[in-house]
Regions:
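Membrane-interfacial helical/loop segments at transmembrane boundaries in membrane proteins
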Residues: 1-3, 173-190, 325-344
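N-terminal signal-anchor module of multipass membrane proteins
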Residues: 1-73
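Juxtamembrane boundary at the C-terminal end of a transmembrane helix
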Residues: 3, 326, 403-415
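Short aromatic-rich membrane-water interface segments that cap or initiate transmembrane helices
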Residues: 20-34, 97-110, 184-205, 271-276, ...
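Juxtamembrane membrane-water interface segments of multi-pass membrane proteins
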Residues: 43-68, 85-96, 123-141, 214-243, ...
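Hydrophobic alpha-helical membrane-insertion segments
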Residues: 70-79, 148-170, 247-252, 302-321, ...
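Membrane-interface helix-loop-helix modules in multi-pass inner-membrane proteins
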Residues: 72-151, 253-287, 408-409
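Long, contiguous internal "core" modules enriched in hydrophobic/ aromatic residues
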Residues: 131-281
Length: 415
């Protein structure tokens, strides 16, 4: 490969902060994005199964998890923007070239995701009614429209396959000319996906099993804390969580082995590196999660911490994934992301962290606390004065941010 060509494609404006900042933020935000994706896939799959079941516990779980999946899609989309932007900053020629090679599929991704989301909302509409004030309530009886859930799940998996292929293509610059001009004939249509690795795709999709199992362990404890009286339903959720945790660990390990066996030549170094062994730590935790929850069944903190631990383990996997990309592109194209030119932009850096920490912190704290408290109240929930103040501050932070956005823009334009 002509390494000087790739170095010439670096953005002459440089990165607005040290590249290490983007690498770390990329890992963390990708892990959070994948956690939301895995919750979405797992709850959507369980909701689809429950919608076709005659078991009343499955039917009840279908209604609850279908609503969870709907929210998880929104969270996954929001959290997916940040890692995408970080990749574009420090791996720009690789990401953009891969996008162009499969341009039709990238554009199709947006359409497929939209249809999948609409299908999920169609199911939600079939199973909920609305009061005059707009308050939704679940319709009685068995869930309706299970085919909408199944269709949504299938389309979400298609979205995952598209993004998987595009990322894979970006790591194989030596193949770009073969894909763009096979046999010397230029094919500029972007209608093909050129690099589908079943093991890699399955690995990230199957992570939804242990992650959703951890979600169910927390859900079980949440129901008990909310004075749930149907203990048969609680036991049903617990049994399902244990089964998913055990099966998920085995399947993720098998998919990982398949992925390692199918690594292309420029990534084979990873098999004998210490990073592969580090990647086994999260899988080992997933395998032990069921045992830990059985031993700590009465530990409230432990039940909730199962999901927190899956986030930490996903961050570990995301870090190992980033090492694979970093070293592969360093060897294949001489691309060292840490050598990226730095043109320090303190205002944009400050705006990012203020947005992420202040706006994100206030709004998430308010929404999560509100959801938590209201879910544990059988009657109409009235927020405390302290929580109401947090909500007021959250709204005020949004107003200030939007106003600041336009004020800064006006100042820059009018210099």
């Amino acid at each position: 490969m002509n390494e000087s060509l790739f170095l010439a494609l670096m953005d002459p404006a440089g990165a607005p902060a040290h590249p290490l900042v983007f690498l770390v933020l990329g890992v963390v935000t990708f892990a959070l994005h994948m956690t939301a994706v895995n919750v979405m896939l797992g709850t959507l799959g369980l909701a689809a199964v429950g919608s076709f079941s005659s078991n009343p516990y499955w039917q009840r779980l279908s209604g609850a998890l279908g609503t969870t999946a709907k929210a998880a899609v929104a969270v996954a989309i929001v959290l997916g923007v940040a890692p995408l932007l970080f990749v574009q900053v420090i791996y720009d020629p690789f990401w953009y070239t891969s996008n162009v090679i499969s341009a039709w599929w990238l554009l199709g991704f947006l359409a497929v995701l939209t249809v999948a989301y609409l299908a999920l909302y169609r199911w939600y509409g079939l199973n909920h009614s609305y009061a005059d004030d707009g308050t939704p309530s679940s319709r009685p009886g068995a869930p309706r429209g299970g085919f909408w859930l199944a269709g949504s799940l299938l389309l979400m998996i298609v979205c995952g396959a598209i993004m998987h292929a595009v990322v894979n293509q970006s790591l194989q610059p030596a193949e770009w000319m073969n894909w763009y001009a096979p046999g010397g004939t230029i094919v500029p249509y972007g209608r093909e996906l050129h690099s589908l690795t079943i093991g890699r795709l399955a690995f990230f999709l199957l992570l939804s099993l242990p992650v959703t199992a951890a979600w169910l362990f927390g859900m079980r404890r949440y129901l008990l804390s909310s004075d749930e009286t149907d203990y048969g339903y609680v036991d049903f959720i617990e049994g399902l969580a244990h089964a998913m945790a055990k099966a998920g660990a085995v399947l993720v390990l098998a998919a990982g082995a398949l992925w390692m066996a199918a690594l292309p030549e420029n990534m084979e170094w990873f098999r004998t590196s210490v990073w592969m062994w580090i990647a086994l730590v999260p899988i080992a935790y997933f395998g032990a999660m069921s045992f830990i929850q059985k031993k700590r069944k009465l530990c409230i903190f432990c039940n909730y911490m199962a999901f927190g631990m899956t986030i930490i383990m996903t961050i570990v996997l995301a870090a190992v994934r980033e090492v694979l990309r970093f070293v592969t592109l360093l060897d294949a194209a001489g691309w060292n992301a840490l050598d990226y030119k730095i043109t320090m932009d303190w205002p944009s850096t400050a705006i990012f962290f203020v947005t992420f920490l202040v706006l994100g912190g206030l709004n998430l704290s308010y929404l999560l606390t509100l959801a938590w408290k209201s879910g544990q109240t059988k009657d109409l929930y009235t927020p405390s004065s302290g929580l109401t103040r947090v909500g007021t501050l959250a709204i005020a932070s949004h107003i200030c941010w939007v106003a600041g956005y336009f004020i800064i823009g006006w100042i820059v334009i009018n210099g």
